[in-house]
Amino acid sequence: MSSIEHVDVAVIGGGVIGCTMARELSRYKLDVCVLEAADDVGEGASKANSGVLYAGFHPRGGSLKGTSCVEGNAMYAHLAEELGVPYRRTGALYVAFHRAGIDKIYEKRERAVQNGLGELEVISGDEAREIEPRLSPHALAAMLAPTTGIVSPFQLVCALARNAAANGVQFHLGFEVESIERADGVWLLHARDGRCVRARFVANMAGEDAAILDAQVHPADIVVKPRRGQFIVFDKQAPENAIRHVLYQVQETDEGGTLLAPTVDGNLIAGPTSENVRSFRDSATSQVGIEHVRRVARKLVPDLDLGQVITEFAGVRANIVNIEKEQKDFVVRASASGFVSALGIKNPGITCAPALVKRAIEILGEEGLALASNPAFDASDQGAVHKRPFMQCSPEEQRRLLEADPTYGHVVCRCERITEGDVRACMRELVPPTTLDGVKRRLRCGMGRCQGAFCAPRVTGIMADELGVAISEVQKGALGGHLTCGEVK
């Protein structure tokens, strides 16, 4: 058995909840590590969502999901400023297309009050179109939720991880926890490859695997199954598709919670569907699912140009299935002595993350974890080599970067205007990417109109050089997939 040094707290999972937990724990005088099964952070549900920060009127009134949504939403302006992550408060319109839907709006309005959001304004369809001109003429009424916002989920997770690492947190990627045991007051976390971490306390934030791991230390009372959500993304160079607010419709019989939203990067996104699937690896899109998203998006904005869709994707989230829908909630609990679990965390998990982590740390404190302040803690994203891509820098910053490294003058991604210097800097950050998809999430190479047709081979070559491997060894994503098999000459 290969053993890693004893730590105070081991965080299982490197998604948004796990990385937020790691960063918050680094505020204290603690030895902390993150154990992530994939080869990069944010490889699970955190990478496959809309990036919407919900106001908090959807979840059941008074639930942990509802109250933490309101609390977490309120924490994001400060968090995004600290980390330098793109964030914008857009507001949302919850739209009714039928008389019964107006009754539903008032039900959600009461939930908002119960969750601590306050009383939201209900406006007529005409008033809604005054502030969102492209909204359907068939909309009868809408509830305005001004605190709804948007954030880049990819940049958020990476910035959280970098900041945690800069403050002393160790990241062990490719560490898939297989078994957990308790010995002499210490938790032993065994990986599939034989490695072992010894921790006084454990924060189980493993997303889809959290319930399985929790069942090793607590009676198996939470059953989690996979639920898939499909999305479509529109070209950001299509201003005719621009909208001002996040748009939801009051749910009808078969239309689920599909929304239409702007993104911080300028694209428009629509989705998700909500489908039970057999495996957490089933992140394929389907014709039926994508047609559903297109139909609902067009219902909200009838003149939406669907010819501007540049990609589609799906994510799979953890759905609790052994509790009645009306009683379902997020679960954050002490499952055993010194062992806290976050279970069944799905949408709006990103919004709730700061508040859920706050509760999890309180639980660890109640379990005996000493929370002495770390005077060296730095809240800024000092783990980044530089804060923004070259093309987003001021002329003075650009001159300085070019003098230090001429590769900043070599554009490798035309759609997103990313340079070779940006890619090389990204590869040298704390918690750097190891796959092409990892670079994509950090810099947006491959997220533009051409979807990597121009930049993929160029970025792959730069990665091979930085990693010191043959170009054929660079993988596309966490599940593998080589882009090349060798050189032709």
List each language-model region with its residue ranges.
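Iron-sulfur (Fe-S) cluster-binding segments and ferredoxin-like electron-carrier domains
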Residues: 419-430, 453-471
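C-terminal catalytic lobe of FAD-dependent flavoproteins
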Residues: 264-265, 276, 281-411, 418-429, ...
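Flavin-dependent oxidoreductases
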Residues: 20, 180-185, 189-271, 275-286, ...
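N-terminal Rossmann-like FAD-binding beta1-loop-alpha1 element of flavoenzymes
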Residues: 8-34
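Dinucleotide-binding Rossmann-like beta1-alpha1 core, especially the glycine-rich loop
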Residues: 50-131, 257-258
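Glycine-rich FAD pyrophosphate-binding loop
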Residues: 27-47
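Helical element adjacent to the flavin cofactor pocket in flavoenzyme catalytic cores
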Residues: 144-201
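Short beta-strand to alpha-helix junction loop
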Residues: 67-70, 98-104, 143-162, 283-288, ...
